[in-house]
Curated annotation (Swiss-Prot):
Residues 1-21 form the signal peptide. This is Cholera enterotoxin subunit B. Keywords: Disulfide bond, Enterotoxin, Host cell membrane, Host membrane, Membrane, Secreted, Signal, Toxin, Virulence. The holotoxin (choleragen) consists of a pentameric ring of B subunits whose central pore is occupied by the A subunit. The A subunit contains two chains, A1 and A2, linked by a disulfide bridge. The B subunit pentameric ring directs the A subunit to its target by binding to the GM1 gangliosides present on the surface of the intestinal epithelial cells. It can bind five GM1 gangliosides. It has no toxic activity by itself. InterPro entries: Enterotoxin, Enterotoxin_B. The gene is ctxB. One of its GO terms (cellular component) is periplasmic space. Its main location: secreted. It comes from Vibrio cholerae serotype O1 (strain ATCC 39315 / El Tor Inaba N16961). It comes from the Bacteria.
Length: 124
């Protein structure tokens, strides 16, 4: 009887942990963060600008509709584990711009200007 109760409890615990596991899409991922919102774009990047100038180290992308987003270049304000992810995002955006890939959605932090990219979803 005790084994049965433990088995049921463990199964319920495991099921609920799995249900809240890895996000299945950008909307689920974005919902895990505060101060974020989803932008649905379905368009290619119109311009890509990269700045290494002092306090304005960032990559900036724009779209035809006028939307502007940024990715900060890793600096002293970032911990080591963030630096590689930021560099990968910057590289992804540069490649998307050069190959004219369509950006489906962006999850952005809306408490920065321009909005800072947290996640990207692209579609062919």
């Amino acid at each position: 009887m005790i084994k049965l109760k433990f088995g049921v409890f463990f199964t319920v615990l495991l099921s609920s942990a799995y249900a809240h596991g890895t996000p299945q899409n950008i909307t689920d991922l974005c919902a895990e963060y505060h101060n974020t919102q989803i932008y649905t774009l379905n368009d290619k990047i119109f311009s890509y600008t990269e700045s290494l100038a002092g306090k304005r180290e960032m990559a900036i992308i724009t779209f035809k509709n006028g939307a502007i987003f940024q990715v900060e270049v890793p600096g002293s304000q970032h911990i080591d584990s963030q630096k590689k992810a930021i560099e990968r995002m910057k590289d992804t955006l540069r490649i998307a711009y050069l190959t004219e890939a369509k950006v489906e959605k962006l999850c952005v932090w809306n408490n920065k200007t321009p909005h800072a990219i947290a996640a990207i979803s692209m579609a062919n």
